[in-house]
Amino acid sequence: GSICLEPKVVGPCTAYFPRFYFDSETGKCTPFIYGGCEGNGNNFETLHACRAICRA
């Protein structure tokens, strides 16, 4: 899906949500910390969900 090509967006908020995003350069789902607001679709709660949607 095209959401897998979107850049990682931490957002301006300062909450601490461990999430995963698909890194289009490496072709892998990678952990990052999401701040809690103004993110995009390339933001998954689990590694499994990221891999399932982005086929990593």
Swiss-Prot record:
Biological role stated in the UniProt entry: Serine protease inhibitor that inhibits trypsin (Ki=73.8 nM) and chymotrypsin (Ki=993 nM).
Protein name: PI-stichotoxin-Hmg3c
Record domain BPTI/Kunitz inhibitor: where: 4-54
SUPFAM superfamilies xref list: BPTI-like (SSF57362)
Site (Reactive bond for trypsin): 14-15
InterPro entries assigned to the protein according to its UniProt record, in alphabetical order: Kunitz_BPTI (IPR002223), Kunitz_BPTI_sf (IPR036880), Prtase_inh_Kunz-CS (IPR020901), TFPI/VKTCI-like (IPR050098)
Localisation: Secreted; Nematocyst
Covalent S-S links between cysteines: 4-54, 13-37, 29-50
One Pfam family here: Kunitz_BPTI
Xref: PANTHER family: BPTI_KUNITZ INHIBITOR DOMAIN-CONTAINING PROTEIN, KUNITZ-TYPE PROTEASE INHIBITOR-RELATED
CDD domains xref list: Kunitz_SHPI (cd22618)
Keywords: Disulfide bond, Nematocyst, Protease inhibitor, Secreted, Serine protease inhibitor
Molecular-function GO terms, alphabetical: serine-type endopeptidase inhibitor activity
Homology family: Belongs to the venom Kunitz-type family. Sea anemone type 2 potassium channel toxin subfamily.
Post-translation changes: Contains three disulfide bonds.
GO CC annotation terms, alphabetical: extracellular space; nematocyst
Other comments on record: Does not inhibit potassium channels (Kv1.1/KCNA1, Kv1.2/KCNA2, Kv1.3/KCNA3, Kv1.4/KCNA4, Kv1.5/KCNA5, Kv1.6/KCNA6, Shaker, Kv2.1/KCNB1, Kv3.1/KCNC1, Kv4.2/KCND2, Kv4.3/KCND3, hERG/KCNH2) and TRPV1, the capsaicin receptors. Does not inhibit the serine proteases plasmin, thrombin, kallikrein, the cysteine proteinase papain, and the aspartic protease pepsin.
Top-level taxon of the source organism: Eukaryota
